């Protein structure tokens, strides 16, 4: 899944805790989902503040998560999470993520979502400032 163009990339250290480990001694599937949420929140903090979105009257809604587990992560591993925007449509967004240990991709994921009007809870177009940020970085990444 590793791509050359990781637009609006966030990188975050992940701490494996004892409660992340299942009876087989490896990280439980549910922990990966929590880590994706942590990555998405860190991404929002860096690029598109959730607080500012709420103030502007809209919120991001997750529609779908797909994850593929490539290798097991264990208690003393030191994973790093990467997340980036892979695509913006008129109304939908898509992010991809990788959980890595050293240079090895342990899990890869894709999430899809929309922004909704905070009062009506109806989908809205991708906010202009996010589209602008995405396209600016996409252009600089390509050059």
Where are these regions (language model features)?
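Terminal targeting signals and extreme-terminal segments of soluble enzymes
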Residues: 1-80, 88-143
């Amino acid at each position: 899944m590793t791509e050359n163009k990781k637009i609006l990339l966030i990188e975050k250290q992940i701490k494996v805790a004892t409660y992340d480990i299942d009876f087989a001694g490896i990280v439980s599937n549910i922990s990966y989902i929590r880590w994706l949420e942590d990555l998405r929140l860190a991404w929002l903090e860096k690029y598109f503040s959730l607080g500012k979105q709420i103030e502007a009257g809209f919120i991001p809604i997750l529609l779908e998560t797909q994850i593929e587990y490539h290798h097991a992560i264990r208690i003393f591993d030191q994973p790093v999470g990467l997340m980036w925007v892979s695509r913006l449509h008129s109304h939908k967004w898509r992010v991809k993520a990788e959980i890595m240990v050293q240079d090895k991709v342990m899990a890869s994921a894709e999430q899809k979502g929309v922004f909704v009007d905070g009062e009506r809870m109806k989908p809205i177009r991708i906010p202009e400032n996010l589209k602008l940020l995405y396209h600016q970085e996409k252009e600089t990444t390509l050059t």
